[in-house]
């Protein structure tokens, strides 16, 4: 299955588990908001440490705005493959499309590692470039 259009970068498999773990720890020792609306508010207010967005959300328009406003607000964000697993990591029995970590609690070191890894992934891939640089005529 192809990735949804709102997924801006690929998350390596070895990073998915630490993302879920950071959520579990932050739920117990910090402060986490659940759901797309709460994540949106956290981004707009500038209080989020990390935004987690599920890739398998239907319809994709539910969460498609999150990466855009994260970029505008310079908020850290990541993607996880499953809304079901995102819900489990949050300690709820239902699916969840997005979550925002507001206070990382004891998960700060995990979140710092995740954010550093994501920064490397994003830096390694030019964003918003539609044409190869070889086409320059100078």
Residue positions per predicted region:
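Short basic, glycine-rich beta-strand/loop surfaces that mediate nucleic-acid
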Residues: 63-64, 68-123
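Extracellular/luminal Protease-associated
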Residues: 43, 48-62, 67, 75-77
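Residue-level signature of catalytic and energy-coupling elements of molecular machines
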Residues: 35, 51, 70
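Polybasic, low-complexity intrinsically disordered tails and interdomain linkers
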Residues: 1-47, 105-138
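Flexible, active-site-adjacent loop/turn segments at secondary-structure boundaries
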Residues: 21, 30, 55, 60, ...
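Short, functional N-terminal and low-complexity linear motifs
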Residues: 4-10, 54, 78-84
């Amino acid at each position: 299955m192809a990735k949804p259009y709102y997924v801006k970068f690929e998350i390596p498999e070895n990073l998915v588990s630490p993302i879920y773990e950071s959520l579990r720890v932050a739920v117990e020792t910090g402060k986490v908001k659940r759901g797309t609306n709460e994540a949106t508010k956290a981004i707009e207010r500038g209080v989020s440490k990390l935004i987690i967005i599920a890739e398998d959300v239907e319809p994709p328009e539910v969460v498609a705005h999150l990466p855009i406003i994260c970029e505008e607000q310079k908020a850290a964000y990541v993607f996880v493959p499953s809304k079901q697993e995102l819900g489990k990591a949050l300690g709820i029995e239902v699916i969840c499309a997005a979550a925002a970590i507001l206070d990382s609690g004891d998960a700060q070191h995990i979140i710092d590692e995740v954010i550093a890894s994501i920064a490397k992934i994003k830096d390694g891939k030019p964003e918003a470039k539609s044409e190869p640089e070889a086409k320059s005529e100078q």
